[in-house]
UniProtKB/Swiss-Prot annotation:
This is Probable inorganic carbon transporter subunit DabA. Its cofactor is Zn(2+). GO terms for cellular component: plasma membrane. Keywords: Cell membrane, Membrane, Metal-binding, Transport, Zinc. It comes from Chloroflexus aurantiacus (strain ATCC 29366 / DSM 635 / J-10-fl).
Length: 838
């Protein structure tokens, strides 16, 4: 039993049942409502999240109806998007017929191709859907004043100060208290609500308890919410502060990941309920009580009108047909890969992240020469670490957010003595303190006026250089406080040690286990090349609050630099190789692992720790660098069209300039377009132009005797890929709810998120400019197509074992197909652990 259940059950002693509503019902409804909210990671590591994560126990169609009723959300593109696809021939009659046959939607729904096409081309708009009512909605209707937006703004203003992570110079005096206690303490002094006409706020604060859980129970009792509508009502309230609720859900996710608890989301729900009670006390006698009594039964009936259900079904069928059209094109390309070559030792094996942006670069690299083999693997390369920068005591988790770091790796300075490192740390700390003090002087509410006059003009040179992209407006956090010489020599230290009382580094046994696991997961256990390149990835942008969203999601929203440098040092260690040999993994003496970083904005490759590469491989390295440079030019040329770059001008210069342009709202397209995840040997896709839309994971099932690697793929990278895909999907089909709006209007709040403008809810998801070029969608909304070359019984067993995987597949949140040894699709997963031939 969790703490929330224990505390709520304790109320049985002091609280009578709410008519037919029991405390158990409140516990269950509160938990379900909170579980419906997907987490939102802060900007410092903005990883992609499936915005429908709390709804995967529903079918896609049922979730669409639920969200339409609870917050007027869309889960499909506008109808004319599909109509245009039909008109252009992209969606065929066969696609429409297949969608109707597969979806099996209940009536009312278009039941024939003719009916579905008639619906697609109809000029009638979709019927309006009225969300479930709240007291704020009713008060808005009755009084003509938008109390719903007022409440959202009020909570958002408070939350921005309370959750601030260091942006504000005047911290909330109650920041150390739990959220609900802090809000009550501030509300006791704040008269904004009364000044705006919510005179019932003081009464609500007096009548409602001082703990969040008791407040939820008491408020539900006062408003007399029916049990069958309680979850819907509480979920609806959380959706009115969706962004802040999502951030609170992240705090809970993070706490639970490390074995703890967090009740901030419950506190936010209680705060929102206090506003409901306050509005009730303020306007009940002005018609709100009567209006609430009339509309409250809607909470127990979430059924849409018949015309709305027909429109929703039609849109879902059109979406399915659109996905069918992509499947048809993708399947036609697969099976046309270059014939597999006779196994022989390659000059270079280059492992990249499975990220869709790597597909373009990998294909370009393979085009430059036939003696390079590329490999796809999650960008943390099997090394889940917390990387602690120099002079810090804590670092970021360099692994997927589904995992916790297993090792703490500290940063050191290569070649420096202990005393020298101590002096470097002291200098960095001093520079950081001075910079912080200077920044406080610049931006503090009082001193900023004295700063602008005498000092402001001195910034003219920097302003010009920043504008021209010659300098960065803000130093990169990883380099801040370090001089140029030191930056060139910082590196991970693997030897066991301590930071405070925390052990750091890895023992030999731990290094061997991690190395073996990584190599097996990459299907790289023999036939090693002379150079094995491990290329993590990151991005280079300026003036971009969501910059970490362009970095590596598998590295927790960081670049993959730390992971590849750690991996390479371990894999080049003779002691590790000796132990690996005992496990049957023999790495030749002339094989050298090399760490690199792929800049996805510029398609440049940076190679790290060149001084550690033996002289015997100098020519190999020089040739590899030439190959990487040539591949970068090819990749930039391919991406130029989508970036609307003038192909007659210098493409390379223009692409690199975008990464330095602080006015550029689209420095790169990120993972826009992502639509497929393929786990198979590279031979199955080699030479096939997949347009940078496919996650490519190398996997050879014949080397996976117990299918543990397959299980890892289907429960980690496949899930992460679906999160990315559905984040882009949600941000495209309903940017109002699941995206972050217009990037040019963003204001960073508390360094943790953005507002669109100066008020409103915290925004989630991606900016509109990340999915749309101003004229057309760049990201085509479609659910992820997973294609795996593995025995069907093995995949079925994994689906049956893991509930989340089964929910995603059985409820239609992603598609799964089986490949044969030619790369041809043979079967599709049909739900309920059944497969059908394709």
């Amino acid at each position: 039993m969790t703490m929330i259940e224990t505390q709520l059950r304790s109320l049985l002693v002091t609280t009578k049942p709410i008519r037919d509503l029991t405390i158990d019902a409140v516990i269950a409804a509160t938990k379900r409502a909170e579980q419906r909210i997907a987490p939102l990671w802060p900007l410092r590591y903005f990883v992609a999240v499936n915005p429908y994560l709390g709804l995967i126990d529903h079918t896609f169609a049922d979730a669409a109806q639920l969200l339409a009723r609870r917050t007027d959300a869309r889960m499909t593109a506008p109808r004319d998007f599909y109509a245009q696809a039909i008109k252009s021939g992209r969606i065929t009659d066969a696609d429409l017929a297949a969608a109707i046959a597969d979806e099996k939607l209940p009536s009312p729904a278009p039941a024939s191709v003719a009916a579905l096409k008639e619906f697609a081309f109809s000029k009638d708009p979709d019927p309006a859907t009225t969300p479930l009512p709240t007291i704020a909605d009713v008060a808005t209707t009755v009084t003509g004043i938008n109390w719903a937006d007022f409440v959202t703004d009020a909570i958002s203003t408070w939350a921005g100060a309370y959750f601030d992570l260091g942006q504000s110079y005047w911290r909330s005096p109650w920041a150390q208290l739990p959220a609900y206690a802090a809000w009550r303490a501030e509300a006791a002094h704040d008269r904004t609500a009364q000044a705006r006409g919510v005179h019932g706020m003081r009464r609500a604060l007096r009548e409602l308890p001082e703990t969040a859980l008791e407040t939820i129970v008491t408020a539900v009792k006062m408003l007399n919410i029916p049990e069958q509508g309680l979850e819907a009502y509480l979920h609806r309230l959380l959706l009115t502060i969706h962004g802040w609720a999502s951030y609170a859900r992240y705090l809970r996710w993070d706490a639970e990941l490390y074995g703890g608890e967090d009740h901030t989301l419950t506190d936010l729900l209680a705060i929102r309920l206090v506003w409901e009670v306050a509005l009730w006390h303020s306007f009940a006698d002005r018609g709100v009580a009567e209006a609430w009594h009339k509309c409250k039964p809607e909470l127990s009936n979430e059924q849409l009108t018949e015309t709305a259900r027909y429109a929703l079904a039609g849109n879902i069928l059109l979406q399915r047909a659109f996905e069918k059209s992509y499947q048809r094109q993708l399947f036609a390309r697969l099976g046309t890969a270059r014939p597999a070559t006779t196994p022989q030792r390659k000059r270079v094996q280059a492992a990249f992240c499975i990220d869709v942006r790597s597909e373009i670069f990998r294909r370009a690299l393979e085009t430059t020469t036939d003696d390079i083999e590329t490999i796809g693997f999650a960008g943390f390369f099997g090394f889940p670490i917390e990387y602690v920068p120099l002079a810090e005591v804590h670092g970021g988790a360099q692994c997927p957010v589904l995992l916790t770091p297993q090792f703490v790796i500290a940063e050191a300075v290569d070649g420096a003595s202990t005393d020298e490192v101590a002096k470097i740390i002291e200098r960095r700390a001093l520079r950081q303190r001075v910079a912080k003090a200077w920044r406080m002087f610049k931006f503090a509410p009082i001193s900023c006026f004295g700063f602008v006059g005498p000092v402001g003009l001195a910034y003219l040179r920097k302003l010009v250089l920043d504008t021209l992209g010659i300098t960065r407006p803000v130093p990169h956090p990883a380099q801040f406080g370090l001089d140029a010489r030191t930056r060139e020599h910082v590196a991970p230290i693997l030897e066991p040690g301590l930071i405070g009382d925390r052990p750091t580094g890895m023992t030999l046994e731990q290094r061997v286990a991690a190395a073996a696991g990584a190599l097996k997961a990459m299907s790289l256990t023999d036939n090693f090349a002379r150079i094995v390149l491990l290329a993590g990835h990151g991005s280079t942008t300026v003036n971009n609050p969501h910059a970490t969203g362009l970095d590596c999601g598998a590295c927790g929203g960081h670049t993959g630099e730390a992971n590849v440098r750690v991996a390479v040092r371990i894999l080049n260690d003779p002691a590790v190789r000796t132990k690996l040999k005992e496990q049957g993994i023999v790495i030749p003496d002339d094989t050298v692992f090399v760490a690199a970083l792929h800049d996805t904005t510029t398609d440049d490759i940076t190679i790290f720790d060149k001084h550690m590469i033996p002289a015997s491989h100098a020519d190999d390295l020089k040739r590899l660098e030439a190959d990487l440079a040539a591949a970068g030019r090819l990749a930039r040329a391919e991406r130029a069209a989508l970036l609307k770059i003038d192909r007659k001008a210098d493409i390379d210069r223009q692409v690199r300039q975008r990464s330095k342009d602080w006015s550029q709202v689209r420095p790169e397209w990120g993972l826009a377009g992502c639509a497929a995840f393929i786990a198979a040997p590279r031979d199955r896709t080699a030479g096939i132009k997949l347009d940078g839309r496919s996650f490519l994971h190398s996997y050879t099932w014949q080397q996976d005797s117990d299918f543990s690697v397959l299980e890892l793929i289907m429960t980690a990278p496949m899930i992460v890929a679906s999160w990315i895909n559905l984040q882009y999907y949600g941000s495209t089909v309903d940017n109002r709810l699941f995206g972050s709006g217009n990037k040019t209007l963003h204001n960073v709040v508390g360094t943790l998120g953005v507002l669109e403008g100066n008020a409103g809810d915290l925004r989630v998801g991606l900016p509109w400019q990340s999915v749309h070029d101003g004229e057309n969608y760049v990201h085509e909304p479609m659910r992820l197509h997973v294609l795996i070359e593995a025995p069907i019984p093995a995949m079925t067993a994994i689906i049956a074992k893991h509930e989340q995987v089964r929910q995603l597949l059985d409820n239609g949140w992603l598609y799964l197909f089986a490949l044969d040894d030619r790369g041809v699709v043979t079967h599709k997963y049909a739900g309920n652990l059944q497969w059908e031939p394709v």
